[in-house]
UniProtKB/Swiss-Prot annotation:
It is found in: Secreted. Residues 1-22 form the signal peptide. This is Viral interleukin-8 homolog. GO terms for biological process: defense response; immune response. SUPFAM superfamilies: Interleukin 8-like chemokines. Homodimer. Plays a role in the early phase of cytolytic infections presumably by recruiting host B or T-lymphocytes. One of its GO terms (molecular function) is chemokine activity. Pfam families: IL8. It comes from Gallid herpesvirus 2 (strain Chicken/Md5/ATCC VR-987). Transmembrane segments: none annotated.
Amino acid sequence: MQALLLVLVLFIVQIYLLPGNGISLESLAVDKRCKCVKVTNRPTGLGPIIAVDVIPPGIHCRRTEIIFALKKNRKVCVDPEAPWVQQFIKKLERQHRTRKENLMVGEDGGKSTVGPVKNTIEPTPPTIGSHICL
């Protein structure tokens, strides 16, 4: 009787773990929780920011998370609604647009006799869900 119960339990577990039954394999491989337990809304004392991670809301977390990577492998979660964070992200977007425009113009200022320089790889501006290295 116990062997039959064990076989039945194993069969049910196997059915639920098969792909296509509401469990995505991706969700099994990623952390299902928010990465930021606590956020700061103060810019003081952060130091140089090396990279920015913007993680959109999803099944793992209901809120947008912004993580700044600092020197010495420190990571700080910041409040996405804080005005200084929004200004910082806008500044990064402006810098990105400027770099993109400079790539399109070319090194000679667009005075090439061959023709306009075409950018074959179009960089995208930093958006939610992106990782930005500074």
